[in-house]
Amino acid sequence: MEQYHGTTILSVRRGNSVALGGDGQVTLGNIVVKASARKVRTLYQGQILAGFAGGTADAFTLFERFEAKLDKHQGNLLRSAVELAKDWRTDRMLRRLEAMLAVADREHSLIITGNGDVLEPEQGIVAIGSGGAYAQSAARALIENTELSPRDVIAKSLAIAGDLCIYTNQCHTIEVLD
């Protein structure tokens, strides 16, 4: 799976709570052009969490398409994700978009890729972007060895990723569904 530079997005679930967070750094090549971008948001009346890694304009196009799928399928995350992935695979314009989405509701956490894949990682941890592997490793260790809330796991994991990945900073946005 191709990783896109310029961000870290992480989702963690524990008990009845799920959180999704990301950093705010936007880069153009090797230059930081913005430090406080908001790459994480709530969708479908606050019932769905979503974050993106990749080109900003591409991600906003995908957010719009995904929101339309959520509306069409009454907020059904799995069905909306599969329908978006189908469109992404078959539509010529969408196939050119370079972004990935991490999405979550109260029951599922998914990665939607431009290859038409809809993945539900094990252990309720989703990570995308250039710092995703660092954040995922930190989150897994924190989930297995602490009682921290999903929000706190994400905050600490993104901080670790920001220390290690040059495309990830310490300006975080975290959304939670309790």
Swiss-Prot record:
Amino acids binding Na(+): 162, 165, 168
Subunit details: A double ring-shaped homohexamer of HslV is capped on each side by a ring-shaped HslU homohexamer. The assembly of the HslU/HslV complex is dependent on binding of ATP.
Protein name: ATP-dependent protease subunit HslV
Compartment(s) where it occurs, according to its Swiss-Prot or TrEMBL record: Cytoplasm
Pfam families named among the record's database cross-references: Proteasome
EC number: 3.4.25.2
Family: Belongs to the peptidase T1B family. HslV subfamily.
Function summary: Protease subunit of a proteasome-like degradation complex believed to be a general protein degrading machinery.
Predominant place of localization: cytoplasm
Gene Ontology biological process terms from the UniProt entry: proteolysis involved in protein catabolic process
Documented activity regulation: Allosterically activated by HslU binding.
CDD domains, A to Z: protease_HslV (cd01913)
Catalytic activity, as annotated: ATP-dependent cleavage of peptide bonds with broad specificity
Gene3D superfamilies registered for this protein in UniProt: Glutamine Phosphoribosylpyrophosphate, subunit 1, domain 1
Provenance organism: Azoarcus sp. (strain BH72)
Gene Ontology cellular component annotations, sorted alphabetically: HslUV protease complex; proteasome core complex
Secretion signal, residue range per the UniProt entry: none
Family annotation (PROSITE patterns): PROTEASOME_BETA_2
This protein's UniProt keywords: Allosteric enzyme, Cytoplasm, Hydrolase, Metal-binding, Protease, Sodium, Threonine protease
Gene Ontology molecular-function annotations: metal ion binding; threonine-type endopeptidase activity
Active site: 7
InterPro entries: ATP-dep_Prtase_HsIV_su, Ntn_hydrolases_N, Proteasome_sua/b, Proteasome_suB-type
